[in-house]
A protein has these predicted regions:
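Iron-sulfur cluster-binding electron-transfer modules in prokaryotic oxidoreductases
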Residues: 1-270
Length: 270
């Protein structure tokens, strides 16, 4: 960590998100492993489920409030809440307080928790120090690999995750970051957008994967499992790595793999 880095807490919460919990649990385990590697204890409230974003972005505010309220009651201690998804972190930071604009006690609770939320890539860079040699340590995996970075729309624009994610990748020995032509564009997931408009979503993800292939990337890394699910399944439908498609991996899992922690594999529960 640099002198300007936030102090390292003794404990943190991890809010895994519903997608990680149900579809990509290894990504959550890898994030927890990286935090514990730094000597930080992890609290994982068993009752956590969803941030409420699917209902919220579909216009079902009452339903979103019920889901969000259930999460608010889980985080009682004054400690960071690490979220391995920029999209969900953005929901918690920017939209939870708005959801409870007419409920003063809940709004105060939402604002307190919003101030505790830290998106994973920021935490990994600024607190764990994984973008500098001291925090990274001697990374045992140095095999050369070309990596493209994808940040979800809300992660990039609401939470500013592009710079820390890029810094974390750049610090890893043997990793070459390649620039894909559609780096700032949506992958077509967009939460429920991919279900409501599958043909448009399919065209968008095909364009994204084509740009990644043209850049020569072997691995496509993102800190958002929603996007990764979309990208992974689209890549598999086109033949997977055997046909030149990139391997899709959560940032936490890629870091864990290169650092030498157990796990590191992108495992999707179909």
């Amino acid at each position: 960590m640099t002198a300007a880095s936030p102090p390292r807490p003794a404990r943190v919460y991890v809010f895994a998100t519903c997608v990680v919990d149900l579809m990509a649990p290894q990504a959550g385990l890898d994030v927890v492993g990286l935090i514990r590697r730094a000597g930080i204890a992890v609290d994982f409230p068993a009752g956590q489920s969803c941030c409420g974003q699917p209902a919220y972005t579909s216009g079902f505010n009452d339903e979103a409030r019920r889901v969000a309220a259930a999460q608010l009651d889980l985080f009682v201690a004054d400690q960071p809440i690490v979220v391995p998804s920029g999209s969900c972190a953005g929901m918690m930071v920017h939209h939870w307080p708005r959801l409870f604009a007419d409920d003063a006690p809940r709004r105060a609770q939402a604002e307190r928790i919003a101030a505790q939320v830290v998106e994973f890539s920021h935490f990994a860079r600024d607190v764990l120090g994984l973008a500098d040699a001291q925090g990274l340590g001697q990374a045992p995996v140095t095999r050369p690999v070309k990596v493209a970075l994808h940040t979800s729309c809300s992660a990039r624009r609401e939470m500013g995750v592009h710079a820390p994610s890029r810094a974390l990748l750049a610090a890893l020995p043997g990793v070459e970051i390649v620039q894909q032509a559609r780096e700032t564009e949506c992958c077509g997931f967009g939460g429920t957008f991919s279900a409501r408009h599958p043909s448009i979503s399919g065209a968008m993800v095909a364009d994204k994967l084509a740009a990644v292939r043209e850049a020569g990337a072997e691995v496509l890394v993102s800190a958002d499992c929603g996007c990764l699910l979309n990208l992974h399944h689209a890549a598999q439908a086109q033949g997977g790595v055997a046909t030149g498609q990139p391997r899709c991996q959560h940032l936490g899992s890629f870091l864990a793999e290169r650092i030498g922690l157990a796990g590191g594999a992108w495992q999707v529960t179909d």
